[in-house]
Amino acid sequence: MKKIDVKILDPRVGKEFPLPTYATSGSAGLDLRACLDDAVELAPGDTTLVPTGLAIHIADPSLAAMMLPRSGLGHKHGIVLGNLVGLIDSDYQGQLMISVWNRGQDSFTIQPGERIAQMIFVPVVQAEFNLVEDFDATDRGEGGFGHSGRQ
């Protein structure tokens, strides 16, 4: 298992609010919690930035972290990430903040310590562009946006 440096920025993390952990041996994501002093009510259509009380430093340029919504919150309550996916670069060292968006039709209250997002680590390949005048022909060519059909 890869070691990632984590800094606790809020003393409640690890005491009142558990550290992020994998729920099962097959879990891909670590749950991130709302490190709030008081509950926050999100009206339909509203967004807010929620602190996690944690900072990470991945350090390895072949890795990045991605923050994703929790499926139950999105499906049952319309609570997703305001930026849809949060990308954490390997050299970022600041607090992990979660942009939360209520795309549902009812107000939703985020409680202190509530699990509101998940974080996964993914490999990164940095590419170098090779400038060309033309591409080698393929069957697909420039077809996109539904080009391959629905069935």
Curated annotation (Swiss-Prot):
Cofactor: Mg(2+)
Catalyzed reactions per annotation: dUTP + H2O = dUMP + diphosphate + H(+)
Binding residues annotated for substrate, in chain numbering: 70-72, 83, 87-89, 97
Keywords from the UniProt entry: Hydrolase, Magnesium, Metal-binding, Nucleotide metabolism
SUPFAM superfamilies: dUTPase-like (SSF51283)
GO biological process, one term: dUTP catabolic process
InterPro entries the record matches: dUTPase, dUTPase-like, dUTPase-like_sf, dUTPase_trimeric
Reported function: This enzyme is involved in nucleotide metabolism: it produces dUMP, the immediate precursor of thymidine nucleotides and it decreases the intracellular concentration of dUTP so that uracil cannot be incorporated into DNA.
Name this polypeptide is given: Deoxyuridine 5'-triphosphate nucleotidohydrolase
Organism encoding this protein: Escherichia coli O139:H28 (strain E24377A / ETEC)
UniProt gene name: dut
